[in-house]
């Protein structure tokens, strides 16, 4: 059975990828975001879910969302980015610049529920990653509340926003995504996931690292970048 990682284990795996295996942050982010786009395309085809609101947070999870937006655009979707607190670092500025030159729309204000329902078919939740600890900060409350209340399907990147990485939902009102894309390996909170689709993405974990942490990851079929758990 595939291993579900604690918060500390997820951090340690990431640090070993960076420090021991010499992966760069942007290298892993590109692979993670690309795998998210592939998982979304498998579950939500463009003919029914072409208009996508991608909600990006300030850290690596948000970076994954920016990469995902670019690849979804190349796949024929019409992504719109909501990025309430951009990170002032070259990596994130470059990702934002790429999206701008790809003519991907960006909204400055969180859409109201009715506005979101009229303008979008799907929401991608790329706000918080496995380093998140509740409660949600003030600048993200509006978008988290939108995702909690909307009837649109939601695809969460690695961790559903607002969830505790190990305990899962903190409150009964916390969002319930339709698709969860676990990156590298699923986190403990994913055991509480009740949505329709659970995918694994991030096909970059070296065999030795898999053995060290007993990840027991399933084998990706052929040239697939994601697989259904």
From Swiss-Prot:
Family: Belongs to the NnrE/AIBP family.
Disulfide bonds: none
Record organism: Drosophila ananassae
Keyword NAD: yes
Superkingdom of origin: Eukaryota
Gene3D superfamilies, A to Z: YjeF N-terminal domain
Catalysed reactions listed for this entry: (6R)-NADHX = (6S)-NADHX; (6R)-NADPHX = (6S)-NADPHX
Binding site residues for K(+): 61, 125, 161
Gene Ontology cellular component annotations, sorted alphabetically: mitochondrion
Cofactor note: Binds 1 potassium ion per subunit.
Name by which UniProt lists this protein: NAD(P)H-hydrate epimerase
Matching InterPro entries: YjeF_N_dom, YjeF_N_dom_sf, YJEFN_prot_NAXE-like
Residues annotated as domain YjeF N-terminal: 10-217
GO molecular function per UniProt: metal ion binding; NAD(P)HX epimerase activity; nucleotide binding
Alphabetic keyword roster: Isomerase, Metal-binding, NAD, NADP, Nucleotide-binding, Potassium
Cofactor names: K(+)
Positions bound to (6S)-NADPHX: 60-64, 129-135, 158
EC number(s) stated in the UniProt entry for this protein: 5.1.99.6
Protein purpose: Catalyzes the epimerization of the S- and R-forms of NAD(P)HX, a damaged form of NAD(P)H that is a result of enzymatic or heat-dependent hydration. This is a prerequisite for the S-specific NAD(P)H-hydrate dehydratase to allow the repair of both epimers of NAD(P)HX.
């Amino acid at each position: 059975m595939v291993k579900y990682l604690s918060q500390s284990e997820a951090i340690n795996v990431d640090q070993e990828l960076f420090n021991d295996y010499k992966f760069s942050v942007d290298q892993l982010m590109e692979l993670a975001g690309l795998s998210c786009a592939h998982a979304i395309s498998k579950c939500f085809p463009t003919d029914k879910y072409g208009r996508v609101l991608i909600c990006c947070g300030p850290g690596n999870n948000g970076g994954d969302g920016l990469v995902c937006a670019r690849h979804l655009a190349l796949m024929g979707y019409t992504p719109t980015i909501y990025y309430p607190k951009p990170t002032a670092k070259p990596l994130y500025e470059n990702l934002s610049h790429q999206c701008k030159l790809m003519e991907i729309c960006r909204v400055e204000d969180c859409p109201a529920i009715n506005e979101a329902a009229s303008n979008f078919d799907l929401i991608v939740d790329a706000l918080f990653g496995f380093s998140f600890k509740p409660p949600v900060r003030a600048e993200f409350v509006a978008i988290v509340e939108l995702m909690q209340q909307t009837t649109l399907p939601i695809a969460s990147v690695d961790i559903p926003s607002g969830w505790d990485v190990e305990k899962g939902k903190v409150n009964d009102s916390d969002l319930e995504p339709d698709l969860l894309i676990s990156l590298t390996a699923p986190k403990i909170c994913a055991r509480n996931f009740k949505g329709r689709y659970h995918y694994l993405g991030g096909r970059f974990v070296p065999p030795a690292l898999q053995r060290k942490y007993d990840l027991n990851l399933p084998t990706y079929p052929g040239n697939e970048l994601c697989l259904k758990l």
